[in-house]
Amino acid sequence: MSIVKNEPKYKNGLLQAIREQLEHRAYWLYLLCDEAGKRGLDWKEFGYPAIRRCGLEHGARHIKKGNTDSLKGLKKVLFTKPAQLVFEMDVLKSTDDELNIDFHYCPLVKAWQKAGCTDEEIATLCDIAMCGDHGIGEAYGAVLDLPKCIAKGDDICSLRYHKKK
């Protein structure tokens, strides 16, 4: 039996349509990793650097778009109201140097559940996907801590960005 609990509280049609788009992309990640694994490649070995690179590039774009490298700016350009609804987020703290957000639902995890991934595969895919968030944080001169993670059996994902001292 799976330890992963991931059911949305809000299920209106528009949210579901947006979530399905995110699920589709998460399914791509799973299929890429699955095919790579069949060829003897370790998912993490290529997934971590590729997705981190994506995060670094997106972080640089977000900084340019928001015209700031403050974590308040990151919240404004990435963790928008629509994103907050889709992932059922609670923004707990947002300052120039600290950003704390709890996610109560993850469409990526839902995609991997639908694909029949094991708990271990879901956790690994999440670790790979989160390299993007780590890369974004790095672009902002911040570190991301993830003390709780839906993909690992927790009830929420706790994203804790803080500027490097």
Task: List the predicted regions and their residue ranges.
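A conserved amphipathic terminal alpha-helix motif
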Residues: 125-137
